[in-house]
């Protein structure tokens, strides 16, 4: 249940990269819905709002600009604005974007659907029609030409957890606050449509600053918690070589600390599912790598699948994470811990038992068992180094990632684009405090450009290292412009191998071949001498070494775009295996009727 208190949430403003060119007008905004929304965003920790202007949202944008603690980041298109809010939310805990009605709202849908799939609270605000136009049988621009213009709302109903259509100032305060608090409680996107004639009108409900939210923590059913802990402890304590595997829902459950408490107490080997990478410290002595079935990191898959009990914490088992439904795990050996439910083998399944409560309590009951860790250490062989290259040999992708491994630190974050970068980045061993993000569940190519923009805008203390394929880059390339305008200093490795490599390995065809671009020329044209941007073409290891030295030295304060030329067939062995298995799953014939 939501209550309100005067206690501030403790958030601090992030420095803004580019001050607004429009003068502040706070005196004209007192007691208005526009000011309330701006203050509410600041109060929940948002310091940057990603936007694309349109005639229905311009007055609202004036009020957001007038808030001194908010920075409006104008994006090149709505899709990237949504992806940027997604990336910002990953680093900051919540993101926000503003677009215009229907033409903007339908353009941002794909990004909001991705945020929904990844359990990210994104506040999607749309400047809507004049409140007087609803129900008048009029036809408006930016609609599909019908007097009923509810199509945008209908689309958002399936990919947001709450929808607020604000057409009346009397209930605007309640609708806005309910939407934002619901996003935070459910960790899902919400949709807020605001009539274009309403943001600047004073109303008594907005006469004072918003009272900060207090989101009461959810408390487990005590009887269910005790039963789940007792049953789980008995299940695990009789096992000979149990393991623990962290999944992506650790984030939404806010249970990373409890996960490590249990891992420390149990002594089990610690693995992560691919979409859980970055949520578990990889410098822990019991960390054994990524469990991804047939494409797991070396020896991790063998240890997990040979265990007689495995604790999956916050997993998502889909066709991608299960490598075409080919995981060699058995339900009767599994303890599945979801954010609000615990399921033990083929037996007990208890709801309203929350992940952090359960793991903390189980840590006190479980016996330490390091058998599987010792087995791992006996069979583990350190990964080899890439084969010695010939002089002036074209750069191999495994050599590129050897250098990226040396580049990352606790002061960096890795953004991995959908494609072969998924597999190469999974093999990176993340130093302590190194961020890591990718979009495993939704898998929308091009996501990483906007996500890099948003993450870098939120995490100003880290330098983002983005790994993007050429096909994905062509989908969303324009917002390199916004990165330069905001003074960001990310390092982008553009892997130019002439096509959609991940699609080639699933099902090849002429549709996977793309027009090659002069990518550094493209970025230089966008740069146009304004802001700090540096580009390089890399064809050999010598080129790469020199480029990284420049990016971390003379150009350390610039956006660095490094185009890496790779052979079209130079893919990770994991992608080859994964692609064949996913292809087999996709091509299953219909079941007999």
Curated annotation (Swiss-Prot):
Signal peptide as annotated in the record: none
Domain of life: Eukaryota
BP GO terms, sorted: aromatic amino acid family catabolic process to alcohol via Ehrlich pathway
Residues covered by region (Thiamine pyrophosphate binding): 420-502
Region (Disordered) location: 1-20
Catalytic activity, as annotated: a 2-oxocarboxylate + H(+) = an aldehyde + CO2
Entries under Gene3D superfamilies matching the protein: 3.40.50.970, TPP-binding domain (3.40.50.1220)
Cofactor requirements of the protein: a metal cation; thiamine diphosphate
Record Pfam families: TPP_enzyme_C, TPP_enzyme_M, TPP_enzyme_N
Coiled coil feature spans: none
Keyword annotations of the record: Decarboxylase, Lyase, Magnesium, Metal-binding, Thiamine pyrophosphate
Any GO molecular function: thiamine pyrophosphate binding
Binding site for Mg(2+): 470, 497, 499
CDD domains (UniProt xref): TPP_PDC_IPDC, TPP_PYR_PDC_IPDC_like
Assembly description: Homotetramer.
Protein family according to the UniProt entry: Belongs to the TPP enzyme family.
PANTHER family to which the protein is assigned, alphabetical: PYRUVATE DECARBOXYLASE, PYRUVATE DECARBOXYLASE C186.09-RELATED
Protein name as catalogued: Pyruvate decarboxylase 1
Origin organism lineage: Eukaryota, Viridiplantae, Streptophyta, Embryophyta, Tracheophyta
Gene giving rise to this polypeptide: PDC1
């Amino acid at each position: 249940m939501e209550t309100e208190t005067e206690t501030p949430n403790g958030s601090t403003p992030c420095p803004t990269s580019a001050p607004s060119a429009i003068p502040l007008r706070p005196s004209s905004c007192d007691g208005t819905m526009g000011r309330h929304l701006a203050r509410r965003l600041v109060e929940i920790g948002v310091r940057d709002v990603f936007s694309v202007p349109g005639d229905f949202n311009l007055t609202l944008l004036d009020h957001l600009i007038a808030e001194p603690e908010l920075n409006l980041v104008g994006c090149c298109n709505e899709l990237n604005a949504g992806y940027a809010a997604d990336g910002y939310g990953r680093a900051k805990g919540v993101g926000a974007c503003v677009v215009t009605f229907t033409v903007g709202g339908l353009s941002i849908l794909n990004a909001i659907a991705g945020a929904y799939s990844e359990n990210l609270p994104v506040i999607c605000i749309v400047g809507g029609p004049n409140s007087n136009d609803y129900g008048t049988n009029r036809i408006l621009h930016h609609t599909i030409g019908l007097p009923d213009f509810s199509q945008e709302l209908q689309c958002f109903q399936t990919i947001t957890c709450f929808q607020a259509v604000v057409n009346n100032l009397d209930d605007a305060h309640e609708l806005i606050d309910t939407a934002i608090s619901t996003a935070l409680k459910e960790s899902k996107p919400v949709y807020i449509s605001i009539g274009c004639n309403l943001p600047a009108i004073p109303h008594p409900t907005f006469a004072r600053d918003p009272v900060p939210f207090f989101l009461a923590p959810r408390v487990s059913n005590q009887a269910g918690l005790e039963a789940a802990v007792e049953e789980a402890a008995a299940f695990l304590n009789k096992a000979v070589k149990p393991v623990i595997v962290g999944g992506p829902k650790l984030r939404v459950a806010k249970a990373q600390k409890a996960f490590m408490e249990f891992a420390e107490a149990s002594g089990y080997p610690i693995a992560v599912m691919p979409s859980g990478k970055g949520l578990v410290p990889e410098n822990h002595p019991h960390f054994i790598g990524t469990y991804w079935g047939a494409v797991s990191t070396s020896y991790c898959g063998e240890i997990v699948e040979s265990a007689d009990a495995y604790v999956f914490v916050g997993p998502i088992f889909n066709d991608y994470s299960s490598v075409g439904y080919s995981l060699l795990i058995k339900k009767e050996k599994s303890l599945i811990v979801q954010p609000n439910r615990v399921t033990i083998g083929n037996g007990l399944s208890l709801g309203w038992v929350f992940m952090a409560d359960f793991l903390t309590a189980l840590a006190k009951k479980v016996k330490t068992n390091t058998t599987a860790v010792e087995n791992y250490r006996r069979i583990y062989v350190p990964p080899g180094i890439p084969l010695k290259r010939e002089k002036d040999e074209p750069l191999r992708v495994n050599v590129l990632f050897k250098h990226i491994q040396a580049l990352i630190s606790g002061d960096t974050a890795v953004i991995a684009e959908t494609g072969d970068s998924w597999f190469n980045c999974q093999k990176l061993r993340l130093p302590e405090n190194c961020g890591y993000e990718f979009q495993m569940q939704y898998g929308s190519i091009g996501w990483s450009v906007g996500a890099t923009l948003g993450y870098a805008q939120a995490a100003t203390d880290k330098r983002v290292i983005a790994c993007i394929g050429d096909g994905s880059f062509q989908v969303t390339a324009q917002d390199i412009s916004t990165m330069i305008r905001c003074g960001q200093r990310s390092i982008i490795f553009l892997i130019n191998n002439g096509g959609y490599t991940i699609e080639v390995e699933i099902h090849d065809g002429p549709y996977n071949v793309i027009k090659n671009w002069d990518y550094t020329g493209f970025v230089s044209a966008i740069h146009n001498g304004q802001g700090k941007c540096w580009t390089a073409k890399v064809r050999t290891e010598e080129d790469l070494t020199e480029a990284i030295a420049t990016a971390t030295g003379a150009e350390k304060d610039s956006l660095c775009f490094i185009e890496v030329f790779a052979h079209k067939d130079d893919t990770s062995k994991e992608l080859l295996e994964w692609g064949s298995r996913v292809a087999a799953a996709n091509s299953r014939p219909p079941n007999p009727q």
